[in-house]
């Protein structure tokens, strides 16, 4: 082992330990190492001496020269008494220098480039097998455009073929719905399936993130153009690019569905006469209500007005939601009893319509009495040409004052 050559700690584990206080042992060890080194130099045919070895020594040339002089004077390769001063100057040899970053020779002898050459500097000559890394994020590239470009690149592989397809379909459907909701404010594709043209002032790639200086129509056209270019050929057929036609719903008449196990419920109408009423033959002259005309063509089987109390006009009062009708200017108001006038105002029936409904109700009562049939609330609803709820209130009011008793109609039998 050389004097100044470092050695790993693992190789020194089996050696004898030398204490720091035993200075004579240190000198003896140094003399042995120098003697072995001189013997090797003498046996070398090249004739190297300590001065040649000192070129690789970490210490100065003057230190090596002094060692050579002492060894030559003694002749036996041992140090003289001046070794103490030498050891005092350099007690412990310093470790070798660490490799520099600029060194171009590695431990295995293969050439390599220094780190300072690859970082922040340009090599002077042509260097092979060197990878230069440059930034790949161009100016103006946003996150959304980068995501679109990445999806478009990955969709070229079969494993990522469905990466951009559902996302693009959703965008197309959303834009179509927005266009329909705006009442076709935006332009659609033509019959030849050509997308809307781009603005002439736009020189960059079409993107959903358009310039805020463009108007709303131009930004919409740019988004449609970008979707058309990026997704052309990814769909199964070209028909998916056709905007869906909006269905125009026309108001249809509701029809009643009848179950075979359920009897059909008949709903009376105020305008259509019923054919299953008993007085169908008596109303052939006035089957429908005609203002100020139909009530005069119907026979009057009503009880006399004298049967109503004269001191009160609330004998026919019923409950009805809604504000009453003002009949103070009606020309037929004198044909009604004051209690009947209050009833007509409450049910919001003009005087001629009230007289028409009154005569139809009692006409049905007489004809059913002739046939021996009872007169019920539903019979009154079928006979009158008014709302069924108002006809029920008329039946309730007339029954309260006793006008529906059979004794009032025995003279017509």
Swiss-Prot record:
Residues 35-55, 189-211, 249-271 are annotated as: Disordered. InterPro entries: Homeodomain-like_sf, SWIRM, WH-like_DNA-bd_sf. Residues 35-51, 200-211 have a biased composition (Low complexity). The modification Phosphothreonine is found at residue 194. The modification Phosphoserine is found at residues 207, 211. Keywords: Phosphoprotein. Pfam families: SWIRM. It comes from the Eukaryota. Residues 316-413 form the SWIRM domain. GO terms for biological process: chromatin remodeling; regulation of transcription by RNA polymerase II. One of its GO terms (molecular function) is chromatin binding. One of its GO terms (cellular component) is nucleus. FUN19 is a non-essential gene. This is SWIRM domain-containing protein FUN19. The lineage of its organism: Eukaryota, Fungi, Dikarya, Ascomycota, Saccharomycotina. The gene is FUN19.
